[in-house]
Amino acid sequence: MKTFDELYAELTEKARTRPAGSRTVAELDAGVHAIGKKVLEEAAEAWMAAEHESDEATAEEISQLLYHAQVLMIARGIDLQAVYRHL
């Protein structure tokens, strides 16, 4: 299990080192528009899971939403502190 901060650090490292076959690198290369579409898709899936599926399925969908939101942050050069200032 990892925290939100640990996930961000892991994704930032992947963006920096660009390992072959990395889903994160592929998503970053696709650009902000494509990443934004994934954020919307995952948000809808989290909502549908919350309406119609188990807590476990909902948690999994939310984890995917958080992943794609962080990839979007990295693509835009937004760090965690910039987001935390708005919480």
UniProtKB/Swiss-Prot annotation:
GO MF terms, alphabetically ordered: ATP binding; phosphoribosyl-ATP diphosphatase activity
EC number: 3.6.1.31
Keyword tRNA-binding recorded: no
Pathway per the UniProt entry: Amino-acid biosynthesis; L-histidine biosynthesis; L-histidine from 5-phospho-alpha-D-ribose 1-diphosphate: step 2/9
UniProt entry keywords in alphabetical sequence: Amino-acid biosynthesis, ATP-binding, Cytoplasm, Histidine biosynthesis, Hydrolase, Nucleotide-binding
Reaction(s) the record says it catalyses: 1-(5-phospho-beta-D-ribosyl)-ATP + H2O = 1-(5-phospho-beta-D-ribosyl)-5'-AMP + diphosphate + H(+)
The protein, known as: Phosphoribosyl-ATP pyrophosphatase
Name of encoding gene: hisE
